[in-house]
């Protein structure tokens, strides 16, 4: 059984992301752990969720948990099991151990993309989170309206396209029969590759190893690189952007994501792999 971990800092963005995570969990038949930072003393110890001798994870009765329990009554068939625990913060050893011990499939975090400090805040937060987890991080923007995924776009240089990453994306996309597009954008400092060579790499190194029919490749014109996020959202119709936390692409893309306070396009969720 897959498990989705939702990070709860008690903000409206966290609640927004958690409700989406619940719908996602129902779709893929996963359970949910809500990891909350809490000051309340109204907690119950749950021995099955112990981190170790230094202390136990704790179950809470937060407003978010009450909301999720109410929301899941909508489902006619599968209803995710929801647990809530306490972490000291989202950057320490507790998070690392939790994602490993519970074999977490996905970590979900909300964000307010319109804050003036959004770029600095999200980059710092993502950097710290990705250094402590071994599974993908799904970042859900506050302005995004829930809908089924139809186009999942993985921005990468084909020469660094990870099979495990594509396999994960294809598995997720299959729940909606969505398209997976590998958008090739040459990494800074590397020579451009011809479209035919890119197609050969895609066919031999990617497509032939992934059992998913709705998988394709598109080239990103070099002239469009400064606005590649706008391109893939508008022209490729991406409703989920996929990145790998690699310096030659990730920083460039996240800077574009927050360009002009996201006024250039409708912000969509980001699925970020830690390696």
Model regions and ranges:
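Short glycine-rich anion-binding loops that position phosphate/pyrophosphate groups of nucleotides
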Residues: 44, 112-114, 246-248
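A short acidic, glycine-rich active-site loop
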Residues: 52-64
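Structural beta-alpha unit
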Residues: 73-107, 210-241, 246-258, 268, ...
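Short secondary-structure boundary segments
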Residues: 36, 111, 184, 244-246, ...
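Generic structural signal for helix capping and beta-alpha/helix-loop junctions
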Residues: 41-42, 92, 116, 147, ...
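Charged helix-capping and loop-helix junction motifs
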Residues: 121-125, 197-201, 254-261
